[in-house]
A protein has these predicted regions:
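S-adenosylmethionine/decaboxylated-SAM
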Residues: 5-26, 45-238
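Conserved alpha-helix/loop element of class I SAM-dependent methyltransferases that forms part
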Residues: 33-47
Length: 238
């Protein structure tokens, strides 16, 4: 029988390996898993709609979605693939916000940015993936008018929308724009929902709260969490 000391050393070894995995890697892997589960869930119901992503960065989430889109099927149990278009919005130049409330020690500058040409090259074989170079804060014009989705060639409701811009202002603007594409059953993913020290009056949490207050016909059900601070909701329209 092993001594408690030797057992503890084995536990320490395992924990050192596990805790040595960068948190960013774990977060992205859990996000990829969440995206896979959602695509599968939608396909079981044969639920139609496109995938939209705000905040493409280097394209890892979009690649997760692209793979999930073409692999979420099973002949054994009769789950058929639902062919979907995937759209990625990003400035491809860095974080954008015009309010001091979005000041953050990490989410600024161009650290998480890749040129759109590099992203397009990465997805050159994915004909159902489109990237749109756009500052999300301009999806709602100064007069309050919402830019029509048809301007970007989108003529279908959304099945999944990922908000990965971390900050309040662009996320609220993207939510307001997305209202025209929502349907009961649309999944909303927020990648940094508990940021800014957990202050619900900042970041993505504030954006969602304000959007729901202004759109009383839209309700959301809690679907779950992923990664370091990701949150998932399902839309219900009144």
């Amino acid at each position: 029988m092993k001594s408690p000391y030797k057992s503890s050393l084995i536990v320490d070894l395992v924990l050192n390996i596990w805790q040595g995995v960068p948190s960013l890697v774990l977060h992205n892997l859990e996000k990829a898993h969440a995206i896979k589960k959602i695509f599968w869930h939608l396909n079981v119901d044969q639920f139609a709609g496109c995938y939209i992503e705000f905040g493409v960065a280097h394209g890892h989430s979009m690649r997760s979605a692209e793979i999930a889109e073409r692999t979420s099927e099973s002949k054994v149990i009769g789950v058929k693939r639902v062919y979907r278009n995937l759209y990625g919005f990003d400035t491809f130049e860095g974080f954008v916000s015009h309010t001091a409330d979005d000041a953050h020690p990490v989410w600024e500058g161009t650290l998480y940015t890749a040129p759109i040409n590099e992203i397009k090259r990465r997805f050159r074989k994915s004909s159902n993936v489109r990237f749109i170079k756009m500052d999300a804060t301009k999806l709602v014009e100064a007069e309050g008018n919402i830019v029509g989705a048809e301007r970007f060639g989108i003529d279908e409701c959304a099945a999944i929308i990922l908000f990965d811009m971390d900050l309040y202002e662009p996320t609220l603007s993207a939510l307001r724009w997305s209202r025209q594409l929502l349907q009961t059953g649309t999944f909303l993913l927020f990648d940094e929902f508990f940021s800014f020290g957990g202050d619900s009056n900042k970041g993505e949490s504030r954006a969602l709260n304000e959007f729901l207050e202004a759109n009383l016909d839209v309700q959301v059900r809690d679907y779950g969490s992923y990664g370091v601070g990701g949150k998932i909701f399902v839309v219900e329209l009144a």
